[in-house]
């Protein structure tokens, strides 16, 4: 077997007249009666190779037997294509290789779907079952290549900035906070379990206490939770931690890192500072803590209508301490029928809204089922507050603030997609700051950490941990890209007393805190530096930069929405002997 001299996708006019040895897969084969043309593919793309009896009758005879996805090696001379056969869509489109030697390395069965037809609609379950074939398709292969380019850019930045790449344990301890853990039974310690890490959070903090100053890791994390398009049971994050820093330092580093990656991978120079918005402002204006700012259509508070209008729904809501907010969709009045509005009402019901009131703006006022409740002054007030004009559709939700935000925030995004308001070429980054430290869980009747229990309260809010925990704000910050949470970070607690107080507010007894996190509390007593960091979702970042619709297209071997590998059939049953060794028994 000869040595390959170059990749198929790199054969260009620079190699004209030279002999090359290529190895790859038969992407396409065309027999023109006396001449056979083959597109030979490898990871860099494909090049046209020609079997011509004038160059080699023997090679032509062998080529007559090859089919799609055969693995072959060829030797030949790079020549210029005839002008009428030039393909300007590919890098190799000006040249072809006249083959004088071919060796069939391996034959292939007919694949269950076409590799060379990117437009063919293939059931995703079939693609996942034959993922090794799916990865041969150029679009998916390019996404995996982009993933490599992103991680390389990340490493270059962090290495240059003095960060140490340090691995942390995969078999660790289960903790009660956060999502459900994946558990690993211990054979040696009967009845005890390791947990796969949801994050290296505690270990990276311990590395700061150890004195390493700057840490990073591109790390696999695991969460046993319900899946959706932008979630996987195992996912990868760019994990970063720094000592002797404040919030501004971490955000500045994170922003510079993201700008470098976008420049390296997309060739886009993001020169402006990323905009910033408080959590309260994001919820008020967009109904979301991760707003998509590629389009306008903001939520507008029209609660004063509940005090001036004779409309019971608005009036009762405001009297009970709720609010009324409106969403004005530009030029949408004629695009939505009564049936469409019923469907939108059902949509907001999902988010807890009891209904969706709406009007269409016409020349002489409003039309629609609640138009009669609006006097002229009310019409003008709505126009003033929302910026609505003739031809617009205005929708209202009246409820408690959390329901209004969730329902209208989701409706805003849905309408933007339906009305084509989103520019998919935009990359709109946004920092969301000033997060609440805690949230109250109505089901468990206790406070839970908005981010995690190790996030530091703002200095001025330390006293509120005793008096009004729900009002305390965190030294926390999220980075949002095009309506997705790309990453989150915070300045951490580095004082044992404050950390113990935080555990107390979260409902831990001293004994529980010591049992679960005693090693961290002890470490704080030996001189812990102030520290903070950020974790960026790599899978999601690749998805957004590559313009894909779900995370599965960014991962070489992903799981389905039900956390199954269709290719390997994981998870699977294990033998009774294995269970016995682990002192486990399956209950059916």
From Swiss-Prot:
Ranges for the region named Aspartate are: 201-204
**Highest taxon above the source species:** Bacteria
* Alphabetical list of Pfam families matching this protein: GAD (PF02938), tRNA-synt_2 (PF00152), tRNA_anti-codon (PF01336)
Please give the catalytic activity noted in the UniProt record: tRNA(Asp) + L-aspartate + ATP = L-aspartyl-tRNA(Asp) + AMP + diphosphate
- Biological role: Catalyzes the attachment of L-aspartate to tRNA(Asp) in a two-step reaction: L-aspartate is first activated by ATP to form Asp-AMP and then transferred to the acceptor end of tRNA(Asp).
Q: Would the keyword Ion transport be found if you checked this record's keyword annotation?
A: no
Membership in a protein family: Belongs to the class-II aminoacyl-tRNA synthetase family. Type 1 subfamily.
Signal sequence, renumbered to the chain: none
Q: List the disulfide bonds.
A: none
| Residues the entry annotates as binding ATP | 223-225, 232, 485, 537-540
Per UniProt, the keywords (alphabetical) are: Aminoacyl-tRNA synthetase, ATP-binding, Cytoplasm, Ligase, Nucleotide-binding, Protein biosynthesis
Q: Cross-referenced InterPro entries, in alphabetical order? A: Aa-tRNA-synt_II (IPR004364), aa-tRNA-synth_II (IPR006195), aa-tRNA-synth_II/BPL/LPL (IPR045864), Asp-tRNA-ligase_1 (IPR004524), Asp-tRNA-ligase_1_N (IPR047089), Asp/Asn-tRNA-synth_IIb (IPR002312), AspRS_core (IPR047090), GAD-like_sf (IPR004115)
Keyword presence, Acetylation: no
| Molecular function GO labels | aspartate-tRNA ligase activity; ATP binding; catalytic activity, acting on a protein; nucleic acid binding; transferase activity
Q: Quaternary structure per UniProt?
A: Homodimer.
Q: Return the CDD domains for the record.
A: AspRS_core (cd00777), EcAspRS_like_N (cd04317)
Per the record, the major location class is: cytoplasm
To which species is this protein native?
Staphylococcus carnosus (strain TM300)
What general EC class does the enzyme of this chain belong to?
Answer: ligase
* GO process terms (BP): aspartyl-tRNA aminoacylation
User: What protein name is recorded for this chain?
Assistant: Aspartate--tRNA ligase
Name the positions where L-aspartate binds.
Answer: 177, 223, 451, 492
Q: Name one GO cellular component term.
A: cytoplasm
Cellular compartments annotated: Cytoplasm
Enzyme Commission number(s) from the entry? 6.1.1.12
């Amino acid at each position: 077997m000869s040595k390959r001299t170059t990749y198929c996708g790199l054969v260009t006019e620079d190699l004209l007249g030279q002999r090359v040895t290529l190895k790859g897969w038969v992407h396409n084969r065309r027999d023109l009666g006396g001449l056979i043309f083959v597109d030979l593919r490898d990871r860099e793309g494909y090049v046209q190779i020609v079997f011509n009896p004038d160059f080699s009758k023997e090679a032509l005879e062998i080529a007559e037997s090859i089919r799609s996805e055969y693995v072959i090696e060829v030797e030949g001379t790079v020549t210029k294509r005839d002008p009428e056969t030039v393909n300007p869509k590919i890098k190799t489109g000006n040249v072809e290789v006249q083959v004088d030697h071919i060796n069939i390395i391996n034959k292939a069965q007919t694949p269950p779907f076409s590799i060379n037809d990117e437009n063919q609609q293939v059931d995703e379950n079939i693609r996942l079952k034959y993922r090794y074939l799916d990865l041969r398709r150029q679009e998916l292969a390019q996404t995996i290549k982009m993933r490599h380019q992103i991680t390389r850019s990340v490493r270059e930045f962090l290495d240059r900035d003095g960060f140490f790449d340090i691995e942390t344990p995969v078999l660790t301890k289960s903790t009660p906070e956060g999502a459900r853990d994946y558990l690993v039974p211990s054979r040696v310690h009967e009845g005890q379990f390791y947990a796969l890490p949801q994050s290296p959070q505690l270990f990276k903090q311990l590395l700061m206490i150890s004195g390493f100053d700057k840490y990073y890791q591109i790390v696999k994390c695991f969460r046993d939770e319900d899946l959706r398009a932008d979630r996987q049971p195992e996912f990868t994050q760019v994990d970063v931690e720094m000592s002797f820093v404040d919030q501004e330092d971490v955000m500045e580093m994170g922003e510079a890192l993201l700008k470098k990656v976008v420049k390296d991978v997309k060739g886009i120079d993001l020169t402006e500072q990323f905009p910033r918005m408080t959590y309260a402002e994001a919820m008020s204006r967009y109904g979301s803590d991760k707003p998509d700012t590629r389009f306008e259509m903001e939520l507008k508070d029209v609660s004063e209508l509940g005090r001036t209008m004779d409309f019971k729904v608005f009036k009762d809501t405001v009297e009970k301490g709720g609010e009324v907010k409106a969403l004005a969709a530009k030029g949408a009045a004629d695009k939505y029928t009564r049936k469409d509005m019923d469907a939108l009402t059902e949509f907001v019901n999902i988010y807890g809204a009891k209904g969706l009131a709406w009007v269409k703006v016409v020349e002489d006022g409003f039309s629609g089922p609640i138009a009669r409740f609006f006097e002229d002054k009310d019409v003008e007030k709505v126009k003033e507050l929302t910026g609505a004009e003739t031809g617009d559709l205005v929708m209202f939700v009246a409820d408690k603030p959390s329901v209004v935000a969730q329902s209208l925030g989701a409706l805003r995004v849905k309408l933007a997609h339906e009305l084509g308001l989103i520019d998919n070429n935009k990359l709109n980054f946004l920092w969301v700051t000033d997060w609440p430290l805690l949230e109250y869980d109505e089901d468990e009747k206790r406070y839970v950490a908005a981010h995690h229990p190790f996030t530091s309260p703002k200095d001025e809010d330390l006293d509120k941990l005793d008096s009004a925990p729900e009002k305390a704000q965190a030294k926390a910050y999220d980075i949002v890209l095009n309506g997705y949470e790309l990453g989150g970070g915070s300045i951490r607690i580095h004082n044992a007393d404050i950390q113990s107080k935080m555990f107390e507010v979260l409902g831990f007894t001293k004994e529980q805190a010591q049992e679960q996190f005693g090693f961290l509390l002890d470490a704080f007593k030996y001189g812990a530096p102030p520290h903070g960091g950020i974790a960026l979702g790599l899978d999601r970042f690749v998805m957004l930069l590559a313009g894909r619709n779900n995370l599965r297209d960014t991962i070489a071997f992903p799981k389905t929405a039900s956390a199954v590998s269709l290719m390997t059939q994981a998870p699977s049953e294990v033998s009774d002997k294995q269970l016995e060794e682990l002192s486990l028994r399956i209950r059916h």
